[in-house]
């Protein structure tokens, strides 16, 4: 295991996840998450929206999930590997001296939310709808809060994670999914059915 992988594991540790390339999608078989009603916005996203208000009031024209193709999956794999390799994992406390700062990793360092923001930005620039690129808060097997990017497709929901270069169906990650951005408004969040109270700070 190289030093970059070790750093990623120290910043956002997830037990049992291998950091290797690949598409974890047997026969493209996956399901979509079942979401509930509106819920609290993570405090880090709330502060991010104050800094980038234009990014938090977008209402995508189409709410249909992306069509799952080999081309889309290659795009997801390429962006995942590129961002994971280009950003050095570092905690908000080490970077900013405080917790829960969501920011683009333009200086080449960041924590799990920052990887998510960058992947979302890059995929959006390639034409993937923001309705299909959803910042998502999960709980890891050890109970710690974590953030990943959910990609909605007509073949199910897939996850891009800074802890692995694989693109996995959401229900094969081992995480408990708690909340994610609403598909119809980038500034709103919805609960995910079956989740529990999030450990990441939220605006109540």
Task: Describe each region flagged by the PLM.
Residues 2, 26-204:
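A structural boundary/capping signal
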Residues 2-13:
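Bacterial N-terminal signal peptides that target proteins for export
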Residues 12-22:
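Bacterial N-terminal signal peptides
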């Amino acid at each position: 295991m190289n030093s970059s992988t070790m750093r990623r594991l120290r910043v956002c540790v997830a037990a049992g996840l291998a950091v290797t390339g690949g598409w974890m999608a047997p026969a493209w078989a996956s399901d979509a998450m079942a979401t509930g009603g509106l819920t609290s916005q993570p405090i880090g996203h709330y502060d991010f929206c104050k800094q980038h208000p234009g990014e938090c009031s977008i209402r995508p024209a189409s709410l249909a999930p992306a069509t799952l193709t080999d081309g889309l999956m290659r795009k997801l794999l390429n962006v995942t590997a590129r961002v994971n390799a280009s950003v050095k994992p570092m905690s908000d406390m080490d970077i900013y001296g405080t917790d829960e700062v969501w920011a683009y990793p333009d200086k080449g360092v960041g924590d799990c939310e920052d990887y998510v923001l960058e992947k979302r930005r890059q995929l959006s620039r390639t034409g993937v709808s923001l309705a299909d690129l959803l910042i998502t808060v999960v709980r890891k097997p050890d109970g710690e809060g974590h953030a990943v990017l959910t990609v909605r497709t007509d073949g199910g929901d897939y996850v891009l994670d800074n802890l692995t270069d694989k693109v996995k169906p959401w229900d094969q990650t081992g995480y408990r999914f708690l909340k994610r951005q609403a598909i119809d408004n980038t500034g709103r969040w919805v609960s995910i059915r079956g989740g529990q109270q999030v450990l990441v700070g939220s605006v109540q």
